Every structure is written in C-alpha cells, then in structure tokens.
C-alpha cells in the first residue's frame, strides 16, 4: 500500500484516536500506528486486507449461493413424510476464513449488518467453514440453476445439488 507522508500522518492520527475511543483494541491500534508512522512496507500490506474489494459479480454470486441454500432448506421442509434428507446436508457452512476471508466477510455483512438470511445458523465459528468452499459452491450452483423449479426441489434434485 503506497501512501504519501500526509496520508500516513492522517492515518496515524486516526489510529491514535481509535486507541482512545476503543481501549479494548488499543494494543492493535498502537501497533498499526507504529507501522504507519515508520513505514514498514511488509506490515503495511496487512492494511490491504482491511480494505479489500469484491466485484459486483462476486457479490451476486455469494448471494446466489446463499439463495440456493435457502431454496434447499425450503424444499427440504416441504418434503413429504418418508422422504428425509439430514438437515445438516442443507445447512450453509460459509467460507474458509484462512483462504476465503473476503467471501466470509461479505456473508457476515449480509447477515449481521444487512439483516439478510438471518435464519441461517452461523454456528460457533460465525460462518467459518474452516475448509475452502468456493469451488464446491460453484458446482452446486450449476446444478441448482439447471433445475426448472428452484424453490420446489424434489429429494433427488436436492441430493444432486448437495453431491455436486
């Protein structure tokens, strides 16, 4: 992250204020302030993670994934007696915090800030699947989008989607 001296001074002052406003995270802010003031290039790259960017297309794909899971859950709940699919199979797990943090952050934003998909269980890890899920979800989306009645799936269609 390239910054002018003026930008670094402004950001340093912001971290100083945040230390006063949020003492619980004061140590983190003081560390970031030191990095900015001294211009430690390697550590300044950490700031890039705080200012990520998701394209509109990627955001729509994440929403499509969550909508697919909503459809799976609705379809499962509408199934007749005798047809059973384990609820855990249609539970949205989220994304891997280590490798898919941008997607995970967007999911948390949608649920916690925007109030969407609040019926999804965040679990104890807050939608951190702890394993990469993007490719799996892409395969599932292709199967789901090919279904003629996406919100009235039969047991066979549900199984095809979750096994994709």
Swiss-Prot record:
Organism, scientific name: Cronobacter sakazakii (strain ATCC BAA-894)
Q: Which InterPro entries match?
A: UPF0304_YfbU, YfbU_alpha-helical_sf, YfbU_helix-hairpin_sf
Going by the entry's taxonomy, the superkingdom of the source organism is recorded as: Bacteria
- Family in the record: Belongs to the UPF0304 family.
What's the protein name? UPF0304 protein ESA_00925
List the Pfam families hit by this protein, alphabetically.
YfbU
